[in-house]
Amino acid sequence: MAELPIAPVGRIIKNAGAQRISDDAREALAKILEEKGEEIAKEAVKLAKHAGRKTVKASDIELAAKKL
């Protein structure tokens, strides 16, 4: 089961144009978002360390997302 709250994930799908969403679809998207988010976070940590920082900044996240 995904750790992300399901309601916001459902809103993301609704904002994309869906009228109805199954619980399985919400869970599947939440799982994928968590996996991708963790990949981006790990890359952002590497970028911050490379820059000599312990703090991950928004720019690290943005660069990591573009890189992946």
Curated annotation (Swiss-Prot):
Does Iron-sulfur appear among the keywords?
no
Q: Which InterPro entries match?
A: Archaeal_histone_HMF, CBFA_NFYB_domain, Histone-fold, HmfB-like, TAF_TATA-bd_Histone-like_dom
Marked site: Interaction with DNA: K14
Question: Main localization of the protein?
Answer: cytoplasm
Q: Name one GO cellular component term.
A: chromosome
Q: Give this protein's Gene Ontology molecular function annotations.
A: DNA binding; protein heterodimerization activity
**Where in the cell is the protein located?**
Cytoplasm; Chromosome
Q: Which UniProt keywords apply?
A: Chromosome, Cytoplasm, DNA-binding
Q: Does the keyword Transcription apply?
A: no
The annotated region (Interaction with DNA) lies at 20-22, 54-57
Task of the protein:
Binds and compacts DNA (95 to 150 base pairs) to form nucleosome-like structures that contain positive DNA supercoils.
Q: Which family does it belong to?
A: Belongs to the archaeal histone HMF family.
Subunit info here reads:
Homodimer or heterodimer with HmtB. Dimers then assemble into higher oligomers, with the DNA wrapped around the protein core.
Q: What is this protein called?
A: DNA-binding protein HMt-1.2
